[in-house]
Amino acid sequence: MKTARIISATVMAAAALTACGSDDDDDHNAAPSSWIRQQYSAATTGSGYVDSADRIPAVAKEIDGNTSARDRISAADVELLRYRDDIVAVTPLAAGGSRIEIDDYRTGYNRWQTRIGSVWPDPASSAFRGGGPGEGK
């Protein structure tokens, strides 16, 4: 009987700890920076990384397939992938292919604000929940 109580208490404690875990959306949505560095070549001009063969939608789909973005904005000349603390932009290369650039959320938001509009939260507002533990929450 004593063993049953110990097992029962252990199971209940494990369930309670699991229920108190952090929000997966906040903790597990970092931009796949390491994967991007491994998958694509460093740009020889400008910044970021390049895929000299694939077009914007295919590259954005590859990145999103590796690590799902919180949200995505698509246009003819850019794909923006929103992650917890970063924005990944996929734009065309003049010679064909795509350029991939990773900005922290605030920099990316300011850079792409004309495309983002009011779709994503302004990092200066109280609605923004990025930036890591305890910030903006």
Residue positions per predicted region:
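C-terminal motif of bacterial Sec signal peptides marking the signal peptidase cleavage site
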Residues: 16-19
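Bacterial N-terminal signal peptides that target proteins for export
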Residues: 1-8
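Low-complexity, glycine/proline/serine-enriched intrinsically disordered segments
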Residues: 21-137
